């Protein structure tokens, strides 16, 4: 509810009035092994058949949605490409090609939102010198599937620019991505302007360390 822009007080009242089983954990999404699809994508990328790759990913999104496509197909493909580069030093052109295809698709999915249910968009950014931003492209698209609008600042967002954007837009949630430990700029936690209500700060990616992220919520999956 808060992500959607509902004021925290109202969200709390709704939550209190909604019966839930406190002893039952929230169900985790079930993901399938899609090694066959991943292998098909890798073969097509090796053949520089970007049309096939793009059509396949778009078909999977239509059939299963962003979250399942990201976790079952796109992440495994990225891991495969990354491992091959680490082992052989080759394939960087494949990684760049694949990344641009995924970005284009996710942008298209994000642009399809017409009637957002949140009056103030969620703010997404890769912090500091972090140039990896595929995950937040996917997050923006996944939120768009739920009619949740976002402001996307992209890669290498300076902390002062982030703070100014928060001041101007009053987002209900700020999501910051750090793929690498060296790019996790913890000053972002204390540098955001004091707003009422305060935006919820969520840190995503393996670059963040929980011990240094007091005052923020950490997530390690796009679920």
Language-model segments: which ranges?
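Long amphipathic alpha-helical segments
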Residues: 1-114
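C-terminal regulatory/effector modules of DNA-binding transcriptional regulators
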Residues: 88-223
